[in-house]
């Protein structure tokens, strides 16, 4: 749950890990497992969390306002990984009811619905400790040559047997990463890989700044792709 100090830091713009407090996070409250939802909606008269766990009914789980902070929160027991959700917001300006995506969502549906998915990011264990420890010494761009391979993951290679679908993160780790290393590059620069609604775009219309696009797999598969890059001594740059 958000503390008064969290809200103070958020209000002054210094809650640097706000993504750990806002969004959807699995918690336990009074012995009940569930998910804590929090969203900043300063001009809302009312906010509810809606999802497939309550029939998308805004009357079921209204959120409580945390005063002048503009933050709303709710704890919903029984919600778990895989449940989809949005926020329904009633404006205090004109009374309009709007369904909004979670700006702190970490995983989204692959269609353009904008629904986020509750997901535990701790299910993956990073394997790049050695790379991270040596990065300042071995990967400094100021004192050594840098050669970057810029790529759009969705169009690098297609799979005819799957109707022309792009490679998954795991497949890219097996095919793209060794290719880039073999070609002598030091870095991979990914054209926008954060969640966006239109698959035919380059990805600059971002709706989820904390979520790698689900078009190529879940968040842990993206982490595995990054791990593969680091295992091949390749730095990663996000466009």
Residue ranges of each PLM-predicted region?
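Hydrophobic faces of well-ordered beta-strands that scaffold small-molecule active sites
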Residues: 147-151, 188-190, 236-238
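Short, surface-exposed loop motifs enriched in S/T, G, D/E and P with embedded aromatic residues
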Residues: 59-67
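Short amphipathic alpha-helices and their capping/turn segments at secondary-structure boundaries
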Residues: 135-138, 173-184, 226
